[in-house]
Amino acid sequence: MLKNYLLVFFISMVPIVELRGAIPIGLGLGLPALPTYFLCVLGNMLPVPFIYLFARKFLIWGYHKPLIGPICRFCINKGEKGGRALEAKAGRGLTLALLLFVGIPLPGTGAWTGTLAGSILDMKFKDVVKACMGGVLLAGIIMGLASTGLLGALSTLFSVG
């Protein structure tokens, strides 16, 4: 049982998969929903301070390196372009926009991407952590409901025809 909890915890730390993949895996392994949810939130949030503090510095450092330069340039350019577009649309509501970006469980919109975007946009650390925490909590609720079949049951209940 402990092995399954550790597996889910570490899966929730993996970029792209994050808690969006860890919650269904945990429930599929027969783990209880609430402990799985909290464990996945913790695992998903654990890398956030490190990403904020070091990812941008690493990308800038690697920008002109022959081996990793193309990847670093791609990440910086993509992050700045997307971040500036988000900033232009959100204006003063950038923290809320980042929360919603992280909270909608779609590929590429998790805490890793949100934290990197916040770092590239020079958002305050506190605002990035708050937005990511809110977004991870929201994504976890959505994934938990979807994984336990509640969303499917509600859509069947309220379907027309």
What are these regions (language model features)?
Residues 118-141:
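Interfacial loop-to-transmembrane junctions
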Residues 1-9, 29-102, 126-127, 133, ...:
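Membrane-interfacial helix-loop-helix
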